């Protein structure tokens, strides 16, 4: 299973330039009236109910209750393959993303990748100094820039989780979105993969996956 996962990583990365172009084209042609909408978790409940009176409003953040909490990148599913690192797995998507970061004063952090608490996963510039890039695998020598890391590390990792750990949640969202509007609440709402100014919304990735428009 570990070797199979590693091959899947390599196949996905080799297709990356084509996938980026494909995503950009399909994103431009995305249907205008989507039944899944992403909104800010910071909006007041009454504001959301007024804007979407007949919608099913769902929290998909790490603070959610029930099964939808598993859609959070912070959730410790365990056994998630670490990109470009055959035979090694981590607890969460966020743990991989943060753990592979390198800084002026710190290299990668395996403890962050093993963290199952959903807390203390963030690695900050204030503590570790200027960022140098994401290491391309635990034992890699190459450092990836922010957007490249987003495409080659974050997106494939989160997709693996959706396909291997969250199919029940995805099936539920697809069924409900066929009947009525579904609003997903996230703390971030940026769905532009190529915009480095804001963190990427995982709720937007869930929406894309449900609609068959996932970037990779």
Predicted features along the sequence, with ranges:
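N-terminal amphipathic/basic-hydrophobic helices that include classical n-h-c signal peptides
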Residues: 1-31
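Charged, low-complexity intrinsically disordered segments
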Residues: 19, 23, 29-216
């Amino acid at each position: 299973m570990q070797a199979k996962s590693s091959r899947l990583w390599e196949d996905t990365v080799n297709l990356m330039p084509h996938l980026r172009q494909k995503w950009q084209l399909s994103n431009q042609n995305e249907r205008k009236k989507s039944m899944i909408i992403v909104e800010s978790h910071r909006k007041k409940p009454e504001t959301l109910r007024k804007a979407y009176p007949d919608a099913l409003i769902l929290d998909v953040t790490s603070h959610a209750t029930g099964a939808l909490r598993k859609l959070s990148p912070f959730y410790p599913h365990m056994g998630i393959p670490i990109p470009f690192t055959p035979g090694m797995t981590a607890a969460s998507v966020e743990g991989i993303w943060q753990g592979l970061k390198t800084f002026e004063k710190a290299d990668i952090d395996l403890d962050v990748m093993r963290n199952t608490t959903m807390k203390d996963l963030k690695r900050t510039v204030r503590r570790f100094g200027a960022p140098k890039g994401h290491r391309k695998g635990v034992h890699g020598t190459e450092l990836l820039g922010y957007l490249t890391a987003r495409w080659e590390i974050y997106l494939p990792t989160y997709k693996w989780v959706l396909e291997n750990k969250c199919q029940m949640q995805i099936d539920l969202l697809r069924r409900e979105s066929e009947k009525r509007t579904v609003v997903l609440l996230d703390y971030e709402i940026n769905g532009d993969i190529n915009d480095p100014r804001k963190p990427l919304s995982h709720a937007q990735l869930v929406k894309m996956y449900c609609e068959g428009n996932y970037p990779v």
